[in-house]
């Protein structure tokens, strides 16, 4: 896994995807494990700066993923990887909710 040391300017430069997922009842551990297994191969992708999955301390079925890519093409490339397709193929059916929201850096007008 590549070292993740970034200056603030690096972190406000790229393409962010914020993902909120909620596992179906009884599926939370499987989903959590699958997200953990995505970290290393995703961080090894050339278009990825950060891939940070989190679990809610208040609701063990709720997860938040912060993804930072070099650009939108990096996100598109990620969705074509074998590890992402394997996750989507087995995990989407275990989710009650999945919401993905992309963001770009804020610049004052």
Report each predicted region and the residues it spans.
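Short S/T/G/P-rich N-terminal loop/turn motif that feeds into the first structured element of a domain
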Residues: 1-50, 56-63, 70-80, 98-109
């Amino acid at each position: 896994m590549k070292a993740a040391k970034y200056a603030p300017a690096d972190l406000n430069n790229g393409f962010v995807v914020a993902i909120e997922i909620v596992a179906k009842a009884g599926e939370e551990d499987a989903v959590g494990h699958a997200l953990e297994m995505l970290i290393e191969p995703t961080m090894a992708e050339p278009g990825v700066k950060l891939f940070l999955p989190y679990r809610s301390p208040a609701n063990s079925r709720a997860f938040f993923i912060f993804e930072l890519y070099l650009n939108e093409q990096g996100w598109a490339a990620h969705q074509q990887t074998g590890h992402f397709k394997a996750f989507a193929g087995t995990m989407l059916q275990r989710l009650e909710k999945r919401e993905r929201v992309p963001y770009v850096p804020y610049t004052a007008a």
